[in-house]
Design a protein with these regions (language model features):
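Amphipathic alpha-helical scaffolding segments comprising HEAT/armadillo-like alpha-solenoid repeats
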Residues: 7-18, 40-53, 75-88
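C-terminal-biased regions
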Residues: 70, 80, 88-96, 100-104, ...
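Alpha-helix N-cap/helix-start positions at coil->helix boundaries
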Residues: 22-29, 43, 55-59, 63
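Short helix-adjacent coil turns
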Residues: 102, 106-114
C-alpha cells in the first residue's frame, strides 16, 4: 500500500515514478515538485518514463512529465515526439481537424496560444457560418462532434495537472449549485463584479485559478457555456 508520507529524495527513480503513476490524487499532487526536481534521475529510465501511462487517456501525470522534460530536457521531448508526430497523447478527429498545434502549445505551456487554437477549433466544429462570423452560437453546440470535444477536454486536462478543461469547469459549477454568477469569480473570469479584461488580465499559466481555461466568450451569455458543459459527450466524462 502506498504510504501518505511526504515526498523524499531517497526514493529511487523507479519508486518515484511508480508512486506518481499509481498514487491517489493527493499523493500525486504532493509529488509534483519532486518530479520536476528529479527529472534528471527520472530521464535515466528512458522509454520506461512514460510506459505506465495510456496514450489514449488523459492522465495529467504523463502530461506533467512531458512539460517538465520540455522545461529542462527539451531534446528528450524532441526524441519522444519524433516517434509520436501527432503528439504523445493519441487523438482522433471525426471531422479531420489536426490537433498537433493544440497539443504542442499545451505541452510548451503556451496557454494563451492554446486558448486561441481552442476557440478556432470550436468555430470549425460549429460550421462555416460560425467561422465567418467569428464566434459560436449556443444553438450550434448540439451538432458539434462529441469525439472532438472530448479530444479538446482530454488535452486540456492532461496538460494542466487536471486543473483546466470543460469537465473541470462543469465540476466546479456543480459544486456551486449550478450558479454561473458564482462560477465566474471562482475561475477568474470576473473580479470584483467586473469581467476580466482579455487577454492581459488573464493568467496564462499553471498558476491560474482552477477552471480558468479554456475561455468561452462570456459576453455571449450563459447559454453558450451551458450548452458546451452539458454536451452529452462531455457529460459522459464527469
Amino acid at each position: 500500500m502506498l504510504s501518505g508520507s511526504s515526498p523524499t529524495t531517497s526514493l529511487s527513480p523507479d519508486q518515484l515514478l511508480e508512486r506518481f503513476a499509481t498514487g491517489n490524487p493527493r499523493q500525486r499532487r504532493s509529488l509534483i515538485k519532486t518530479v520536476e526536481a528529479r527529472i534528471g534521475d527520472l530521464e535515466g529510465l528512458g522509454d520506461g518514463l512514460l510506459a505506465p501511462f495510456d496514450r489514449a487517456g488523459d492522465d495529467w501525470a504523463a502530461g506533467w512529465i512531458l512539460q517538465v522534460l520540455h522545461r529542462h530536457r527539451p531534446e528528450r521531448v524532441s526524441e519522444v515526439l519524433d516517434r509520436c508526430p501527432g503528439g504523445w497523447f493519441k487523438v482522433e478527429s471525426a471531422v479531420g481537424i489536426d490537433y498537433r498545434d493544440l497539443q504542442q502549445d499545451l505541452l510548451q505551456e503556451d496557454f494563451q496560444s492554446a486558448d486561441r487554437t481552442t476557440s478556432a477549433v470550436l468555430r470549425q466544429l460549429a460550421g462555416p457560418e460560425a467561422e465567418r462570423r467569428g464566434y459560436v452560437y449556443f444553438s450550434e453546440v448540439a451538432t458539434m462532434s462529441g469525439g472532438d470535444l472530448t479530444v479538446i477536454d482530454r488535452l486540456w486536462t492532461a496538460y494542466s495537472q487536471g486543473r483546466f478543461g470543460f469537465t473541470t469547469q462543469a465540476r466546479l459549477l456543480q459544486a456551486l449549485g449550478g450558479r454561473y454568477d458564482l462560477l465566474w469569480p471562482r475561475i477568474g473570469w470576473k473580479r470584483e463584479g467586473t469581467w476580466t479584461r482579455y487577454p492581459g488580465a488573464f493568467t496564462w499559466s499553471l498558476e491560474a485559478p482552477e477552471g480558468h481555461m479554456p475561455l468561452v466568450n462570456q459576453l455571449r451569455g450563459v447559454r453558450l457555456m451551458d450548452a458546451l458543459l452539458n454536451h452529452p459527450a462531455l457529460q459522459q466524462r464527469r
